[in-house]
Structures are given as C-alpha cells and as structure tokens.
Amino acid sequence: MRIFNLEEPLIYSYFRSGFYSFISRDMVLLQKITDRSGVCLKVFFNPLIGDIKDYNWGHPFLVASNNMAPRSERARLIDAVIIQNLCAWHGLAPRVYEIVGLSWEGKIYPALIVDDLGEASDMVEWDQRVKIMEAIKKIGDKYGFYTEYEDLGQARNFIKDKFVDFQAFKLKPDYRDQVIKRYKAKAKWSENTYQTVPELGIGGYRDNERRLELMQLNKLDFTGKSVLDIGCSGGFYCRYAKDRGASRVLGVDLQNVADAAFEVSNYLGYYDINYSGMKLEPNLDYNFGFSIDIIFYLSVYRYFGYAPFLKKAKMIIYEHNGDVPEEEAIKQFSKDFPKHWEVAITGRDTGSNDDRRTLIFAKE
C-alpha cells in the first residue's frame, strides 16, 4: 500500500459524510496520488492498526445465526473492495482503483481511489433502490458474496443507479476456490488452461515464470509506461507490467477470457488493470483510448497479422507462433513497419514443441 503524507488536514462536510468515511475531492492531493481523471478519495475515519488485510470497514451488523442467537458481522475492507469491483464490472458500483494510506499526525488512514459519481441525493425512489440491490444480489449469487443487511433505508448509498456502501458485504468462505474454478473454465486455449497463476497454485499450458526468464523482460523498463496486451489470456503479463511499475495497463481478449482475467486480478489486488472483452478483426485499426508505450503481442500473429494499431506503440514485445522462421518474421515486420528496428531475445518457451523466439521491435 502506498503511503502519502498530508500537509494539512482534509476538509469535509459533516452532513454529507458517512459514519465511517467521507469523500475528498482535494485536487492537490489527487494530483499527487494519481494521474486518473474523474476520481475522488473515499477516506476512512478509523486509523489503520496492523495490516491492511485485517482492516474492517464500518461497524458490526447484528444478524441472526442458524441457532437464532444474534452475531455481529462486518466486512474486511479488501473483501468489500473485491465485491465492489465485481459489481462495478457489471455497472452496479463505482470502481475502486487502489487502496492508499494517508499519513497525518503519526497515524495512517486508509483511503480508496474510486470513480467520482458526484453528490449523493436523498431523493432516490425506494423501488429504484430495491431494483439495484436485487441486481447486486444476483451478482453475488453468481460469484459468491452476500449481505444480510441491505441498508435500503439510506437513499444516499445509491448514486446514478449505482450502490456505493459495501461495508455489510462479505465473500463466501469458498470464494477463492470458486475463482480458481471459473478461471480454469474460462481462461483456456483449446482444452487447456493457458496461463499459470502462481499465486493461486494454478498451472497451465505455458509456464509463464519460466517464459519471463527466457524472454529477459527484466531488461526492459516498464516504469511509468502505458501497456497494452493483445490476447491477454489470464492477465499474467498485465500483472507483471504493473509489478514492474507500469502506470496504465489494458488487457484485451474474448469476453469470457477477459472476465476470468479481471476476476483473478481483482482478487489478487490489481484493482487498476483494465480488461476489455472484444473480438478483434484482422487488418482493422483500433483506438484503445490512450497513448501506448508497450504492446505485448505474444502468439497472436496467426490471428491478426501485423495489425495497423501496432504502429501506435513505441515498443512491441512480439512472439511468433512458431509457424514461420524467425528470419521471415523479422523480414515481414521490417517490410510492414520500416521505421522500426528489432532486437532478438533468444530462448525456448516451455510448453511448446518448437523454438519460439521473442523479439523486441522498438521505434528508432
């Protein structure tokens, strides 16, 4: 978690804040923390004690247990963020991009960088609140989260047809297992799980940790770069780019695959990686909405050729499919993109029966 020192206390409206958090739109602080537009900070009143993984959002809610004895429940902040982003993926909540810490007078206060929906209103109709909550509960049934306290009485928790207060939501005990199961079912190539997810013990057709070593990507600088991964599969290289300091990352694949990549990344805490489910057509140009520094173009040439949008990148990390000799791949790329020069990085990619050499094409 990144920590930022406050130079002065944040100002908030007592009448517009919640019991446990408030919204800050302090532009000086936001510009210090993020380059994203259209976001605000949701700052929590209770300081952090111990690990952020153990930080709870809000107060305990009394709910009935199976033996009719009441018990208290409240959500861990990181679980609530996972749930909120699952709802955001379906258009039912503002998206959380990062959990940061704000340091003031020796204490650290957790805060969320989140989509700014504007001011809340007390005029949201009851039927509309019920409609939104029912949609969220269906999403919970699909993924594996729940609430026993819907809090429909607070109209201000519903802004622009989205719900903003997930302090009473919890993940089901088997959620991790369900994430793994869904990933294996969706992030596939042929009949195989394609990319490994070491953090979850998921193996795959391509040993990505070994591939990183062979591709020698550690020699490249990702700091502050915007990265596009075409055919991102399970999002392994998207997460790698973020770990290496990339400022913005977008992974593109078929919708079902993008769903799996998003859920795994969200569960692992990579909240700010964007995923897009779309079917790219060969020889068509696409505007991905941002200036691209680096494109991962791994084993997708046979589907798209040298797509026109590759020209927009400053660097292309390219792996051919093994169906053409390396020299032919370089020759064809040089013909299509004469303003580029190439550096070959040698090595055999595991999981393949051929030598697939990864090439770096970089603009002069």
Regions found by a protein language model. Give the residues of each.
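ATP-binding glycine-rich loop module of kinase domains
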Residues: 29-77
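Conserved kinase catalytic-core helix
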Residues: 83-91, 120-162
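Conserved HxN/HPN-centered segment at the entrance to the catalytic loop
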Residues: 89-99
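Conserved structural core of kinase catalytic domains
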Residues: 97-132
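Conserved beta-strand signature within the Rossmann-like core of class I S-adenosyl-L-methionine
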Residues: 313-325
